[in-house]
Each structure stands twice: as C-alpha cells, then as structure tokens.
Amino acid sequence: MRYYEIVLIIHPDSDNQIDNLVNYYSEIIINSTGKIHRLENWGRRQLAYAIKNLNKAYYLLLNIEISKNILDILDNDFRFNEIILRYLIMRTKNIIVDPSAMVKKKDDNNQEGNNSTVCI
C-alpha cells in the first residue's frame, strides 16, 4: 500500500452532492482495505483562473493509503465524473494527518471572531 494526497476541484453548483461524492469515494477506499488518514473540505473558493467559465469551485483534500490498482480505478472515475473540474494525485512518502495550512488559516480566522466553519 502506498500513501497519496488527492486534491479535487468540484463544480460550484454541486454543493448538495459533495457529501454524496465524499461518501462514494470513501466507500471505494475503505472497501478495498485502504485507509483515509485526512479528509478536509476547504469550501467554495476563488479559482486562480476560469475553468469552464467558472470563477469559483469547491476544494476537497484527501490523504489516503491504497494500492495502485485501486488508485487507477479512482483516477479513471475522477476523469469521467462531470462535477469534478480538476484533480491532482500526488504520491507521498509517509502518512500526513496534520491539518493543512488552509484549515489552520481558517481556524485562526475563527479565533479572531470570524464565524466560518470547516468540515473535516
């Protein structure tokens, strides 16, 4: 089993489908004896450049441990899923479970009185 970090950029009009998407991919990973070490929903954010005439999208970050053949299945599924605008799969050398800089930044904002929430 290898460790991977996956970032998904999801269509902004599919906010009600994000939970279903996360559950679907979580089931695939867990049923294949894989593990999800970190799952972060960064929320709806401004894109650096327009993708399919969209300026905002939802971001999801996953750190998982799976085998190569299951990664190929996920890669194929990401490619043909219409609500996933872009995705990035990176192999990592070890498990990453610490909160990302995006979550830390939002936590700092929460402590300053901002009421934005993070779903992990």
Curated annotation (Swiss-Prot):
SUPFAM superfamilies: Ribosomal protein S6. One of its GO terms (cellular component) is cytosolic small ribosomal subunit. It comes from the Bacteria. The keyword RNA-binding applies. PROSITE patterns: RIBOSOMAL_S6. GO terms for biological process: translation. Pfam families: Ribosomal_S6 (PF01250). Gene3D superfamilies: 3.30.70.60. One of its GO terms (molecular function) is small ribosomal subunit rRNA binding. Binds together with bS18 to 16S ribosomal RNA. Belongs to the bacterial ribosomal protein bS6 family. This is Small ribosomal subunit protein bS6. It comes from Blochmanniella floridana. The lineage of its organism: Bacteria, Pseudomonadati, Pseudomonadota, Gammaproteobacteria, Enterobacterales.
